[in-house]
Structure formats: structure tokens, C-alpha cells
Amino acid sequence: MAKFKQAGAIIVRNGKTGPRILLVTARRNPDNWIFPKGHVESGETLKAAAVREAREEAGIEGKVVGAAGRMSFEFGDNAYRVTYFVVRTTGEGKEREGRRLRWLKYKQALRRLTYEETRDLLRDAWPRIKVFAATRASGSRKKK
């Protein structure tokens, strides 16, 4: 069995009533809702790959603000280990690669995510995600 390393992004932004989480549909099965993820290119860090996947799959420019967790799965004859990061953005995103996008509250995202392993990842990371989503970008200040 071939083994592959991937990176993924749990994309968050602040909404009027709290953090919103971006889900995308899977390219191979548009009924499956997931977090953007994919291969790590040669010489690329996991964090850089997560940011690139957010851009490629969701049209999001963002910044890694923390670790979210790891998940392993098998697909066909391959084994994958995905390292997820929380990527914070202020953007809306843009549907790309034939994928749909949805900004959801935490409980809505749990219901929409297709795979139990991904729901577990979100549950485990949620306390950190709330903190990361609320943290202002370094160097930015509120106007008085």
C-alpha cells in the first residue's frame, strides 16, 4: 500500500454571531462535503500546502493561525495522512474546480460534513478554532 502525506485547511472567518467554517464539495463526489485538502508538493511545507489548497479549492487567501489536528484514511490501494491547519480569512471564497462552497456555523458544519472522521476532527479542534477565529491578525489594531 502506497502512503501519502497531505495538508488540509479548516477555513474560518468571523461572522456576526460567531465563527463561520467553510466547507467545499469533493471533486470526485459533489454530494460529499469536506475541508479543502490535497498533496504536498516537493519542497513545500505542510502549512504552505494547506494555504495553497485553500486557494485552489475555495478561492481563499488566508493565513495559518494554528494546528487543527491529523487524520488518516485509506482510499483504494493508498493510505493518506492529512495534517489540518486552521486558516483564517476575511474573504468570501470563490467556487473553483467544480466545487460548491458553504459558510456554516459550527453545528451546521457538523451536520453537513460527510465523513465521521472529519466531524471528529472538527469537534476536537473547535475550542482552538474559536480562539484562532477571534484573534486579530498580528500588527492590526482596533480604531479608537
Positions of PLM-derived features:
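Structural detector for helix-capping/boundary residues
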Residues: A7, G38, R52, L104-K107
